């Protein structure tokens, strides 16, 4: 704590993200309004004294996926010096999308997925996935689909993710083979095309309490170029959720094996029959769309202050 007894908070970002993260200004202002000493350090800045903070809150560390080993080593070190939110064990679990299998095993409805490991025969794996028979998916069941998605298990902001038509197997195979050849765990998923009309629903929680929800426009278009920047531009608008979406989002939060996170974002889309299914659970560095909900920055600031004093 500072000499006045107020906490010192780090909102952790990355150099390229500092000017792009639209959540940072309102959150910084909400904390400062409570007398909190706020800094915006970059996670890989070796000059930062992490022990001088009462809590370090991961915000826009959006370059972590290309430096995952370095990032997790930093998180381990940081957690030894101060409170890290979300905690390092949560971050380690959440940065690998195989957590989706655990959610599915806990009874949470999740987009059907096939995981593919480096060393596997890319052509055979893709053929099995598209055949749709027994064993075609690691978990879940998919009715007939026309498009599908190839993406890395460790990735952020749709980077290296692409949508393909079933008839475009050559391009999809090249993408899958490239990811596997570079040693990256990869995932194949049916593209649930209701998202084109309905979009995604992002449900945001602070300290286990529902804060707000938004609609995210569909990101992956057939034949689009891979995302090259830190994140893909998104069309965001407020959205009220129904009981079905709320139920799935809460069930997802309860399935996290490491206790209640400071912040969480559950991304939902409509399945084949319109019921909500989990696309992703974001516990590391999600955009929280604070500008879309009055009072959300103040709610998160209050949760941060409370955690800093635990």
Describe each region flagged by the PLM.
Residues 165-256, 277:
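Phosphate-binding site of ATP-dependent enzymes
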Residues 2, 7-13, 75-80, 89-198, ...:
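Active-site nucleotide/adenylate-binding loops and adjacent lid/helix of ATP-dependent enzymes
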Residues 16, 63, 155-156, 193-194, ...:
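Short, solvent-exposed loop/turn segments at secondary-structure junctions
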Residues 241-310:
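ATP-dependent carboxylate activation and anion-phosphoryl transfer catalytic cores
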Residues 5-8, 15-121:
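Conserved N-proximal alpha/beta basic substrate-recognition cap immediately N-terminal to
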Residues 155, 208, 273-274:
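Short strand-connecting beta-turns/loops that link adjacent beta-strands
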Residues 53-58, 201-205, 275-287:
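A short beta-strand motif that forms the metal-chelation/ATP-contact edge
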Residues 44-46, 189-194, 266-269:
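Short, solvent-exposed loop/turn elements at beta->coil junctions and helix N-caps
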């Amino acid at each position: 704590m500072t000499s006045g007894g107020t906490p010192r908070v780090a909102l952790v970002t990355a150099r390229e993200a500092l000017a792009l993260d639209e959540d940072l200004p309102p959150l910084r202002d909400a904390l400062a309004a409570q007398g909190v000493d706020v800094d915006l350090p970059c996670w890989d800045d070796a000059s930062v004294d992490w022990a001088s903070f009462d809590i370090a809150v991961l915000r826009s560390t959006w370059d972590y996926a290309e430096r995952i080993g370095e990032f997790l080593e930093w998180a381990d070190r940081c957690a030894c010096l101060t409170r890290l939110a979300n905690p390092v064990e949560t971050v380690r679990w959440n940065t690998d999308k195989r957590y989706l299998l655990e959610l599915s095993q806990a009874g949470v409805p999740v987009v059907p997925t096939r995981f593919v490991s480096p060393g596997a025969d890319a052509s055979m794996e893709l053929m099995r996935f598209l055949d749709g028979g027994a064993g075609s998916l690691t978990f879940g069941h998919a009715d007939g689909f026309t498009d599908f998605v190839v993406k890395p298990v460790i990735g952020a902001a749709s980077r290296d993710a692409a949508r393909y038509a079933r008839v475009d197997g050559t391009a999809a195979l090249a993408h899958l083979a490239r990811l596997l050849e570079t040693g990256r765990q990869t995932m194949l998923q049916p593209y649930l095309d209701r998202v084109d009309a309905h979009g995604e629903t992002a449900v945001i929680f602070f300290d286990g309490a529902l804060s707000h929800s938004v609609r995210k426009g569909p990101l992956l278009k057939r034949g689009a170029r891979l995302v090259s920047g830190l994140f893909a531009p998104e069309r965001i608008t407020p959205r009220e959720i129904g009981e079905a979406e709320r139920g799935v989002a809460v069930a997802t939060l309860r399935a996290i094996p490491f206790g209640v996170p400071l912040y969480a974002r559950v991304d939902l889309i409509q399945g084949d029959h319109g019921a909500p299914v989990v696309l992703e659970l974001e516990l590391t560095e999600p955009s929280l769309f604070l500008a879309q909900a009055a009072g959300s920055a103040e709610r998160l600031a209050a949760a941060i202050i409370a955690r800093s004093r635990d």
